[in-house]
Amino acid sequence: MGNRIVIIGAGGHGKVVCDAILSQNEYVINGFVDANVPVGETVINNYQVIAHQDNLEALKTQVDFFIVAIGNNKIREQVFNLAKTILQPATVIHSSAVIGSEVKIGEGTVVLAYSVINASARVGENVIVNARTVIDHDCIIGNHVHLSIGTMVGSNSTVDDFTTSLIGQKMDSFSKI
């Protein structure tokens, strides 16, 4: 298996996910998948849309990994579940992020610029940890969550599946949302 990746979603979130992938220097971006943009159209950083979601099967020989760059949690879950029947989900961590010891990060999760995930935290599958988010030690973040820019999750807190935080939202230690 190689390191070729496709980004599913060519909107605003796709831009920051693309930047995170480029910062990692781990994957080779083959292009984007987007249901609302014609195949062949150049969209972000001179990458083209190479398929629509309903034609992911055609990418099996061109791409090894995928990452979903769609902000809506429910839609992101649906696309993630479909895509992982065909391709391998990637985990994308921006090079400026800080990841503590014994942290577990699920498949399909994106950790964006200047975020911090402290020791023994667990982050589920297909999660957006947006820029400058802090997840303190021993937190549990569910699946298909979107922690918006600047969210601060205090130690030993739990964030349930499908939760979306507000920009700059703060959760005290031992909280549950």
Residue ranges and their predicted role:
Residues 9, 66, 89, 136-137:
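Generic structural signal for conserved hydrophobic packing positions in ordered secondary structure
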Residues 91-177:
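Structural signal for interior beta-strand "rungs" in well-ordered beta-sheet cores
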Residues 15, 19, 77, 143:
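Alpha-helical elements of the RecA-like P-loop NTPase motor core of helicases
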Residues 37-98:
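Phosphate-bearing ligand-interacting subdomains
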Residues 30, 64, 107:
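Conserved acidic residues
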Residues 1-44, 50, 57-60:
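Hydrophobic, well-ordered beta-alpha structural blocks that scaffold small-molecule cofactor pockets
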Residues 21-23, 45-48, 80-83, 106, ...:
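Short, glycine/charged-enriched secondary-structure capping and boundary segments
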